Amino acid sequence: MGELKETTTAVMEPGGGAGFATTKFEAALAWAQKYSLFMYPFVTACCGMEFMGVSGPRYDFARFGSEAPRFSPRQSDLLWVVGTITQRQAPILKRIYEQMAEPKWVLAFGTCASCGGFYDNYTTVAGTDKIIPCDIYVPGCPPRPEAVLDGLML
């Protein structure tokens, strides 16, 4: 993301009333992009229900800087791996990770994404870190919303 170079702020007082501040749109957009996470959800299994619950109004994670999901990896910087990853899905996940712009982070959501879970057989991958580097692990089956928010705040 770009650095915030210059901010031009002017206080305008229409008719002598209370003032309000205006700023350049580009500067405000650069600041928002610098301090917001744009996520790409890779949802494959039952943890997807808890992911939807965390992104709902009760545990609104947009208040912590994680904005609406982007469904293009080129526009996102946080990859949420939610659920079990099979051997057939592994190349797709790797390609999505490679398409993401720098800087990029990966969050493994749940036990299956972290270490394979109880699906320990030849068709599943025993953890996201066997395919791509993983930065944050949120344990649980499914993880509690509070644990997800704690992982997001790291």
For the regions a language model picked out, list residue spans one by one:
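Internal helical hairpin/lid segments
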Residues: 74-76, 82
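Iron-sulfur (Fe-S) cluster-binding modules
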Residues: 1-72, 100-104, 122-124, 130-137, ...
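Metallocofactor- and cofactor-centric catalytic cores in central/energy metabolism, strongly enriched
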Residues: 2, 63, 81, 85-90, ...
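A mid-sequence interfacial segment
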Residues: 111-115, 127-130
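Gly/Ser/Thr-rich loops at beta-strand to alpha-helix junctions
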Residues: 48-50, 84-88, 113-115, 143-145
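Structural motif
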Residues: 77-78, 105
